[in-house]
């Protein structure tokens, strides 16, 4: 359950879940073994709701007019935020405003995630079919999104 919360926050902040189109956008997250870990559904207003594999709401994310994404738990309590600068670097903050990590995407589409100390915590890559593969700092596959 923890992996879906972490991945979901990263996916939204990195702009990997889109709200374009008339139909709600639904993404399914799977672990390295291909087991369903949950979903993220974005409505036409840009609010994303995260659910676990059993369909229970785990939290949500919404973006304001200034591009700041705020994450909330299932009870609606603020869990943190993310903002992206003009260079494409996304900074994640906890509910108290302290920096918890960053994400940067290179020209090949590989996103590198770092903790607050600048250490690499993982990467993600997107293939030609749109499947995103997530790896830990050692390069092991930890999950996918399609």
For the regions a language model picked out, list residue spans one by one.
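Bacterial N-terminal signal peptides that target proteins for export
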Residues: 1-8
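Intrinsically disordered, low-complexity proline/glycine-rich segments
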Residues: 23-146
């Amino acid at each position: 359950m923890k992996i879906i919360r972490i991945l979901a926050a990263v996916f939204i902040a990195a702009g990997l879940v889109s709200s374009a189109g008339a139909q709600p956008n639904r993404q399914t997250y799977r672990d390295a073994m291909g087991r369903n870990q949950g979903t993220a559904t974005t409505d036409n207003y840009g609010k994303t709701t995260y659910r676990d594999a059993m369909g229970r709401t785990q939290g949500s994310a919404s973006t304001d007019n200034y591009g700041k994404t705020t994450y909330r738990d299932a009870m609606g309590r603020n869990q943190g935020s993310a903002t992206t600068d003009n260079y494409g670097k996304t900074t994640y903050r906890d509910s108290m405003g302290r920096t918890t990590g960053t994400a940067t995407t290179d020209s090949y589409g590989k996103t590198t995630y770092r903790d607050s100390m600048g250490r690499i915590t993982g990467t993600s890559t997107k293939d030609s079919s749109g499947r995103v593969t997530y790896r830990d700092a050692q390069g092991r596959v930890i999950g996918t999104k399609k």
